[in-house]
Regions:
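C-terminal motif of bacterial Sec signal peptides marking the signal peptidase cleavage site
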Residues: 16-20
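Bacterial lipoprotein signal-peptidase II cleavage site
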Residues: 21-32
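Short, polar/charged alpha-helical segment
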Residues: 62-74, 83-104
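Extracytoplasmic ligand-binding site segments that recognize negatively charged/polar headgroups
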Residues: 79-94, 106-122, 129-264
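A ligand-binding cleft/hinge motif common to bilobed small-molecule-binding domains
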Residues: 139-145, 267-287
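Periplasmic-binding protein-like
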Residues: 175-179, 238-243, 249, 285-310
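Mature extracytoplasmic/periplasmic domains
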Residues: 299-300, 304-368
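Extracellular/periplasmic bilobal clamshell ligand-binding domains
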Residues: 348-394
Length: 394
């Protein structure tokens, strides 16, 4: 269920999205006026001097969305990796993309983390089976920019400068918050402190090892903030989980849909958009799945990042995929999966956001904490030296 995720954008980017969720704000100082080219489909931004859709660096250079996606259809498929169906509504995203463009989506290793995405791309380079698209956290993404092909989709101008690499090597796509998801039969849970209760012995799971999975990493950050720590001091977070382990409450299990459904992991610390997708699937099984952003610390958020593999076996289809996920339709699909899309502010201004989905997501009133790259690097080193009391399998 885990993927290595973290931050590449400025804190302001997330703060703006939180404001949009909380108050219905319709403008952002870091967003350009919404581009009509960002609507789903169409031949927007077509160029009279269009280049090859397989190597295009912009929508216009590829001849427009229609031309790019037509070329992608001839390639037959686009290969994704680390995109679980329930994660930010990726399952629906893939279905809608195929229905619209007739391009098959090959989804490999849905539970892979970011480093495994990169490893897979290297191991399968040139075979035709390598991933065409990456969806990465910052620790890994920042270390492998030489593996990406720059591309600027039709909605490029709607994306704040702080949420994208200048040439399009990577683009922040969506964000969310660290939350506690739980079976309501266990009683109300509102904060990290609640998880120390003896009645939760053997019931708490962290989504992924903090050394390799961003949900786990940011779970430690959130626990630190809830226990007197800060973005510069994760020791209280490590101590918190060490205590949970000693109590027997934290278990060495990497949670997934099956462990939740079976009752093995009835409490999961994870991203809102990962657990949000389980609400509807668990309901028929008699499980009322609740999600709460812990109240005993500032909320923790992080954007994910979209990038095209420069060694993509289906380069036009990869560009078509990027066009779709950053279109209004794609961004609203993420929103329906409890994820806040990067173009949210521009879409609100244009009146193209799904208001019902936006209202369902909700957002904490407090501005979220997002580690800088320097803080992420320091925290990673600290965890390597101090996270030794429990091993959460990949």
């Amino acid at each position: 269920m885990h993927k290595m995720r973290s931050r590449l954008a400025a804190l302001a980017g997330i703060a703006v999205l939180v404001a949009a969720c909380s108050s219905g704000a319709s403008s952002s100082p870091s967003s350009a006026a919404p581009s009509t080219a960002a609507s789903a489909g169409g031949s927007a931004a077509a160029s009279t001097a269009a280049g090859d859709p397989k190597t295009a660096k912009t929508t216009a250079e590829g001849g427009g969305v229609d031309a790019i996606c037509a070329a992608g259809k001839t390639e037959g498929q686009v290969t994704l990796i680390a995109t679980p169906d329930n994660w930010a509504n990726y399952g629906q995203m893939m279905k809608d993309f195929t229905a619209k463009y007739g391009i098959k989506v090959q989804s490999d290793k849905p539970d892979a983390n970011s480093q495994q995405e990169i490893d897979q791309a290297k191991q399968l380079a040139g075979t035709g089976r390598q991933p065409d698209i990456f969806d990465l956290g910052s620790v890994v993404a920042a270390a492998h920019t030489d593996m990406y092909a720059p591309y600027q989709p039709a909605g490029w101008k709607d994306i704040p400068d702080g949420n994208k690499e200048a040439t399009g090597l990577w683009i922040n796509n969506y964000t969310g918050f660290i939350a506690i998801a739980y079976d309501s039969k266990l009683g109300d849970i509102t904060k990290f402190a609640d998880l120390k209760d003896p009645k939760y012995k053997g019931k708490v799971a962290l989504n992924g090892d903090p050394l390799s999975a961003s949900a786990g990493f940011n779970g430690v950050v959130a626990a630190a903030l809830a226990n007197g720590g800060s973005a510069d001091n994760l020791a209280p977070g490590v101590d918190y989980f060490k205590n949970l382990t000693t109590l027997g409450n934290l278990i060495p299990v990497n949670p997934n849909d099956a462990t939740v459904a079976s009752g093995q992991t009835p409490i999961v610390i994870d991203w809102t958009y990962n657990q949000g997708g389980l609400i509807s699937t668990l309901k028929p099984k008699g499980i009322d799945w609740k999600i709460v952003v812990p109240s005993d610390g500032a909320p923790v958020a992080a954007f994910y990042n979209e990038a095209i593999n420069k060694d993509a076996a289906h380069p036009a289809a990869a560009r078509c995929w990027v066009e779709y996920v950053f279109s209004d339709a794609g961004q609203n699909t993420w929103l329906k999966g409890f994820a806040l899309p990067v173009r949210l502010q521009a879409m609100q201004k244009a009146g193209t956001v799904d208001a019902t989905a936006l209202a369902a997501v909700g957002a904490p009133a407090t501005a979220p904490v997002q580690l800088t790259q320097a803080q992420t690097d320091a925290a990673t080193k600290f965890l390597k030296d101090n996270w030794k009391f429990i091993t959460i399998p990949a």
